[in-house]
Amino acid sequence: TSRRQRQMCIRDSQLVLLYLFGNSIIASDMFLNMFTTNSGEAFELLDKLAPAVVGVFLLYLPALALAVYSIRRTETLTPLFQKRVFMLAMLMIGSGILVYTPAHRKYPHTAKLDNLYPINAFNNARFAVDSWEAAKNYPRTSRKFDYRATSTRDTELPEIYIFVIGETSRARNWGLYEYERNTTPKLNAMPDVIHFDDVLTQINATHKSVPLMLCPADALNYNEIYRQKSLISAFKQAGFHTSFLSNQLRNGSFTEFFADEADCTIYFAAPKNKPHLHDDVLLSAVDSLLNIGKTKQLIILHTYGSHFNYCERYNTDCRIFTPDHIKEIDHKNKQAMINAYDNSIVATDKFLAQVINKLDRTGKTSAMLYLSDHGEDLLDDERNRFLHASPIPTYYQLHIPFVIWFSDNYSTLFPDDIRQARNRHTTPFDSRVVFHTLL
């Protein structure tokens, strides 16, 4: 798609963004989400956003029809009409300058044109397109990056580490985090599971939050990511066989670039025109990897977790809270929406318990880490916020579950690690902790 076509697509989508995040500016990450969201995800959302979709048709179709009609009739505007429109435009511009000038003098650092709509929307759209284009050069800009990593442990010691990347899972709705519903019964019953109470994501959008878990860059120095490789490369240099299994589609983001660093990279895509596969599709591949005979392994599982539409993220055995189907996103359907979301957490709990059990049965030195990429708004308060990736995030979008499990062998060999984890489970962290913890 050409740059101009993308910008047109961005402009036409502003009404939908305004419907979702009406009290926020239209930020660059909103536009980047358009590039990294597949058609299936988009349809699942738009199917429940009738007012915004109808608004697009009511606003754009009549205007387009009138334009075509006028062109075919070769109609031209009269000089008098053109003069009046010009005078009105000059009056509006002049009024804006009169209002802006004293504000700029009093607050020179905040009263900028970049903060005005629609200038800020177009500027952010341009920034998003530029960022997307810059990402295409990543293979060249990161080519010389080298961790020079080596392992400090016995090369003959069997080690298996699985990092599960969650999707749209907020800590508030986990039973493990004292939620009123026990949405995590299996993890609650595992005494070796350690959860961290106060962990925030750096960014509330998948296309940025996941890569920042996997590399040294952080939200304050995001541009460093263009020159860095992920921890997958570090593990490979240290003698590990690496695998990246994803229940999400390729999207041209840094997540995809990092995934391709692995020795084994597999994307599980649903058949065309079918609902997205559930995360348990990854488990058979995990079984295969655990039996390939590699002494040291790093396995990364990128799940689809609790991504909207929530009721399509779990099997019937996880359908605990009902009703859980909605026709439209509004307050009258709020409880059903929460029921579906909670059921998706139940499915995540079951999935993680299965991963832990598989590791435990190997009898090897192993550990599992789980961290969600970001949380979610569920019409929680008077702001009526929904979804994620808004320019002004809420705590619901930022507070995420972070869970670690260690095998008995690991606990025996490295008791200090276990002690540190338990002693610091209430310490505030952000998602940068994953990169350093895994290494």
Where are these regions (language model features)?
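Single conserved hydrophobic/aromatic residue that forms the stacking wall/gate
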Residues: 1-9
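Membrane-interfacial interhelical loops
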Residues: 10-58, 105-122
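Metal-dependent active-site segment of extracytoplasmic phospho-/sulfohydrolases and closely related
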Residues: 162-163, 344-387, 435-438
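Active-site-proximal alpha/beta segments of enzymes that process anionic O-linked groups
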Residues: 97-163, 168-328, 430-431, 436-439
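Internal/C-terminal transmembrane anchor helices
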Residues: 79-105
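Non-catalytic, well-ordered alpha-helical segments in soluble enzyme domains
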Residues: 236, 410, 415-439
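Histidine-centered active-site microenvironments of extracellular/periplasmic hydrolases
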Residues: 178-182, 364-365, 371-415
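A long, amphipathic alpha-helix that forms part
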Residues: 284-287, 325-368, 404, 425, ...
